[in-house]
């Protein structure tokens, strides 16, 4: 999320998990002709008043390029998975893009959540050349801040983008993001010393945070997120070779493939104890893979802790 003040997607999820336009002019729907009846085509209309930090216009060519750039295997882009199932991304006009999927796709917003980079800056650095792009160390985006200093592993300084496309934003003239160090030092710099205004997603023990709060200048705000920490066990057989591979998806683990075994393991999980003694205030015990926003948190998934139960 560190690039969010500088680079933007077509859409993003708000605090309620609803998709809202950023660089897109509107959310596609059946009513406005943006979604096809067969669930395979999405038409994105783009804002017309958006400029890159270097003054060049943001257009459909950039959106098409971001797809081409990300899915090139030689680039090894971490965003490539968000384009899974996309057959093609086509330019309709200067500010309209058509995305065609190989099959009906309900999560068609995912590829639109990719933070955009400018074609005119990165076109010469496709594939394996992507690592050599000078803009990797001084990114050019459309966001509310533009980078004036970037020291990898240490510091990013951003200044207000006077041409930002959303009115009355941002609210600060200068942004300084400090990297490096460890989580405890970051918490201390904000909560105790007051050297920085904000630290996000602190992986620090709750007791340590409480001590910092008691005599410090800052406070801890706990906001449940949508991510879940869990242990995943492979239900394939590691001792059997299928098509030249062990633990092949077509094989079945002799123990873990038994539903009764998995049910028993669920009953042995003391989620409340893990929440209290490991995560403290910052943890929310849940049997769901998606815990937030609340409307996606299923109440029908069993989470009983009972070592005496029979399955």
List each model region and its residues.
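Structural transition elements
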Residues: 145, 284-311
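Ligand-site clamp/hinge motif
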Residues: 43, 133-136, 163-211, 259
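Aromatic- and charge-enriched surface segment that lines or borders ligand/interaction sites
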Residues: 26-76, 92, 98, 186-192, ...
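Surface-exposed binding/hinge segments that line
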Residues: 79-127, 149
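Gly/Pro-rich hinge or "lid" segments in bacterial periplasmic/extracellular proteins
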Residues: 4, 12-18, 113-176, 309-311
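N-terminal lobe/hinge region of extracytoplasmic solute-binding protein
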Residues: 1-37, 68, 138-142
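A bilobed periplasmic-binding-protein/Venus flytrap-type ligand-binding module shared by bacterial periplasmic
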Residues: 159-163, 181, 228-260, 277
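Ligand-binding "clamshell"
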Residues: 208-223, 235
């Amino acid at each position: 999320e560190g690039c969010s003040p500088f680079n933007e997607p077509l859409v993003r999820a708000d605090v309620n998990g609803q998709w809202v336009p950023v660089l897109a002019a509107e959310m596609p729907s059946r009513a406005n002709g943006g979604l096809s009846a067969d669930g395979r085509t999405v038409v994105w209309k783009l804002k017309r008043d958006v400029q890159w930090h270097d003054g060049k216009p943001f257009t459909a060519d950039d959106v098409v390029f971001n797809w081409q750039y990300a899915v090139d295997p030689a680039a090894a882009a971490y965003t490539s998975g968000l384009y899974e199932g996309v057959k093609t991304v086509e330019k309709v006009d200067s500010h309209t893009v058509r995305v065609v999927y190989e099959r009906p796709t309900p999560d068609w917003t995912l590829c639109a959540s990719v933070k955009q980079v400018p074609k005119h800056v990165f076109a010469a650095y496709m594939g394996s050349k992507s690592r050599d792009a000078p803009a990797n160390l001084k990114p050019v985006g459309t966001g509310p801040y533009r980078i004036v200093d970037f020291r990898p592993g240490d510091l990013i300084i951003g200044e207000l983008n006077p041409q930002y496309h959303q009115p009355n934003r941002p609210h600060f003239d200068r942004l300084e993001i400090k990297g490096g160090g460890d989580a405890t030092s970051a918490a201390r710099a904000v909560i105790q010393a007051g050297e920085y205004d904000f630290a996000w997603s602190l992986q620090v023990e709750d007791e340590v945070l409480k001590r910092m709060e008691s005599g410090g200048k800052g406070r801890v705000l706990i906001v449940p997120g949508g991510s879940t920490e869990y242990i995943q066990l492979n239900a394939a057989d590691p001792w059997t070779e299928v098509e030249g591979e062990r633990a092949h998806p077509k094989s079945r683990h002799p123990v873990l493939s038994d539903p009764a075994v998995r049910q028993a393991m669920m009953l042995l999980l003391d989620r409340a104890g893990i929440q209290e003694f490991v995560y403290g205030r910052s943890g929310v015990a849940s049997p769901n893979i998606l815990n937030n926003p609340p409307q996606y948190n299923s109440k029908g998934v069993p989470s009983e802790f009972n070592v005496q139960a029979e399955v």
